[in-house]
Amino acid sequence: MDPDTVKSTLSNLAFGNVLAAAARDYKKEVLANEKAQGSRPVNEEVDLDELMDDPELEKLHADRIAALRREVEKREAFKRQGHGEYREVSEGDFLGEVTRSEKVICHFYHKEFYRCKIMDKHLKTLAPRHVDTKFIKMDAENAPFFVTKLAIKTLPCVILFSKGIAMDRLVGFQDLGAKDDFSTTKLENLLVKKGMLSEKRKEEDEEDYEYQESIRRSVRSSANVDSDSD
């Protein structure tokens, strides 16, 4: 796909989903105003066709599109720094990885330790959900200098870095109920509490999912058009 096509696709991303979300917001505002004024609640569904020419809704739509574009640009910038996936790094790359990003979660592991594999599974799940935090891992056997420097005695050991400084750590599963069957949500909440992850609301997850799905559909559609034209 050529750059102009990509730019055009991005400019029209998620119109249907965003407009529907804007309509929901608009309806909530109407209901809130009705309630505040002591009027009868409005139960009718919002007609999107009637709202299309509403200047307030158009502004709301434009603001939402602009916010989503900024979010996409921010995500892309994070991904260029290695965010959005759970990656293995070498000892030689370690310092660069933890100093180039504001928040970094690094799992020091041993490939034969069962509990390290459990931690791997959870961190791999969290990495794409929290793009503003970098998730990496390093084989403790191949990183003797940093294992000693960071005084790592027990594995798994998850070191939490903020602006290149080791601020906290998770040693084994002692902060996770000392059980192997803890949930990803439990780990996520712990990392939120420690300031390493941003708390995500359910609405944000749903809108983000819809938006990303619309991106994929738009790209697939453009790709099919290109294929047909060939």
UniProtKB/Swiss-Prot annotation:
Residues 220-230 have a biased composition (Polar residues). Disruption phenotype: No visible phenotype under normal growth conditions, but plants with reduced levels of both PLP3A and PLP3B show defects in cytokinesis, cortical microtubule array formation, oriented cell growth, and maintenance of proper ploidy. Residues 89-173 form the Thioredoxin domain. Expressed in roots, cotyledons, leaves, stems and flowers. It comes from the Eukaryota. GO terms for molecular function: beta-tubulin binding. One of its GO terms (cellular component) is cytoplasm. It is found in: Cytoplasm; Nucleus. Keywords: Cytoplasm, Microtubule, Nucleus. Transmembrane segments: none annotated. Residues 199-230 are annotated as: Disordered. Its main location: cytoplasm. GO terms for biological process: cortical microtubule organization; cytokinesis by cell plate formation. Pfam families: Thioredoxin. Belongs to the phosducin family. Interacts with TUBB2, TUBB3, TUBB4 and TUBB5. Tubulin-binding protein involved in microtubule formation. This is Thioredoxin domain-containing protein PLP3B. The lineage of its organism: Eukaryota, Viridiplantae, Streptophyta, Embryophyta, Tracheophyta.
